[in-house]
C-alpha cells in the first residue's frame, strides 16, 4: 500500500531554521497537547536527532523503525528523521516518490506547500 499523499503531522524538531518559524508558527504557538516536539541533537543530523529522542514513543516513529534513516522502517519503507534539511515530519508520501512512499514511511520536510501534500486530521479524546 504505497503512495497517496504526503501527509504533514503535528510534529517537528525544535531546530533553528527560518522555515520552521515561517511555516510552523501556528503549530509552534499551539497547545502542547496537540503536537509532538522533538529536541535537536548537538549535531543536527538525522541519525543524531533520532537517537536524541529515542525515549519518545506514541507517534509511530520508534515503534516502526530501527534507525533514523534510509529504508529502516518496517517493510523497508523509507525513513529520514527531520534534521537541518527540514524540521517538519512528513508521513506516507505520494506515488510519484516511488520507493520513498510507504504506509510506514516518515521523513523530513521544509514545511512549504506543494502538489500532493495534505494533512491527515485525527480526533483524539484527551
Predicted regions and their residues:
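Short, ordered coil/turn segments that flank beta-strands lining enzyme active or ligand-binding pockets
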Residues: 1
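A short, polar/charged loop-to-alpha-helix boundary motif
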Residues: 15-25
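C-terminal, surface-exposed recognition/capping segments
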Residues: 4-14, 27-126
Amino acid at each position: 500500500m504505497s503512495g497517496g499523499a504526503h501527509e504533514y503531522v503535528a510534529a517537528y524538531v525544535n531546530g533553528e531554521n527560518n522555515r520552521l518559524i515561517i511555516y510552523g508558527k501556528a503549530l509552534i504557538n499551539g497547545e502542547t497537547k496537540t503536537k509532538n516536539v522533538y529536541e535537536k541533537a548537538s549535531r543536527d543530523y538525522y541519525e543524531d536527532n533520532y537517537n536524541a529522542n529515542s525515549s519518545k514513543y506514541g507517534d509511530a516513529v520508534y515503534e516502526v523503525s530501527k534507525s533514523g534513516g534510509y529504508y529502516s522502517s518496517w517493510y523497508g519503507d523509507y525513513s529520514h528523521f527531520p534534521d537541518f534539511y527540514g524540521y517538519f515530519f512528513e508521513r506516507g508520501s505520494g506515488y510519484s516518490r516511488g520507493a520513498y512512499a510507504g504506509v510506514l514511511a516518515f521523513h523530513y520536510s521544509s514545511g512549504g506547500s506543494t502538489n500532493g501534500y495534505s494533512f491527515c486530521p485525527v480526533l483524539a479524546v484527551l
